[in-house]
Design a protein with these regions (language model features):
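C-terminal cap/substrate-recognition subdomain and adjoining C-terminal extension
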Residues: 69-83, 90-225
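Alpha-helical substrate-recognition element adjacent to the catalytic core
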Residues: 1-113
């Protein structure tokens, strides 16, 4: 099972931050609480994304390109019969729009929902931990419980939680630095073309579970279920 983050992993910019920064900047007090660890992404979204206009948000998202290697990864995974899903602490509003534009609208997406201005929903939230809107850890954990081996792709701080339940991790940026600090092995990548090379060359070992290095990251202390 391939499980990938969206913002700054599939997309070339953080679309959620672009939309909020342009249409409804995060309030300084909420940002300060977030920086101190007293608030989570859900608090940021409620203070900002909840107040954006749907059409304006989609118009901004439509200007964002995706990593061209992602299309190749999807095509390869489908030929090999490997399921692939997107997990994001952002919103289906822009994720599904961008994927649909790229002919990838059939991919499953685990993310938050913008219903209308002033109303957000958290279909993949974790009742035991309200910090994130979409609990990436719970999504990865559920896929593992169904019998899948999970290969995770990510870049950001929320990916720390999802990666902690993966068998293998492809990481860059903040996630890569966190894994290095915690001495957990990972595959570095700058784009999906890099990752696809590794997957193609080692598919049999990924399939039978013998591919090394496997992730040794333990569940994050913040993760509760």
């Amino acid at each position: 099972m391939l499980l990938t983050d969206f913002d700054f992993t599939i997309s070339l910019v953080d679309v959620g931050d672009l939309i909020c920064g342009t249409l409804a900047p995060y309030p300084a007090d909420v940002l300060a609480r977030y920086a101190r660890g007293e608030a989570g992404s859900r608090d940021l979204w409620l203070a900002s994304f909840a107040h954006v206009d749907r059409d304006e948000a989609v118009a901004l998202a439509d200007r964002v390109d995706i990593d061209p290697g992602f299309r190749d990864l999807v095509a390869w995974a489908e030929r090999e019969g490997i399921p692939l899903a997107v997990v994001s602490d952002g919103f289906t509003l822009y994720i599904e729009h961008i994927l649909g534009r790229e002919g990838l609208g059939h991919l499953p997406v685990f993310a938050n929902r913008y219903v209308e201005r002033g109303r957000l929903e958290w279909p993949n939230g974790n009742p035991a931990c309200p910090l994130c809107g979409c609990c990436k850890a719970a999504v990865a954990r559920r896929l593992k419980a169904s019998g899948s081996r999970v290969i995770y792709f990510g870049d950001g701080s929320s990916d720390v939680y999802g990666a902690s339940f993966a068998d293998w991790v492809f990481a860059k940026s903040t996630l890569a630095r966190f894994l290095e600090q915690n001495r957990s092995p990972y595959f570095p990548f700058t784009g999906f073309a890099d990752a696809l090379d590794v997957l193609r060359q080692n598919l049999d070992r990924f399939r039978d579970g013998t591919m090394q290095p496997r992730s040794t990251l333990r569940p994050h202390p913040r993760c509760r279920f």
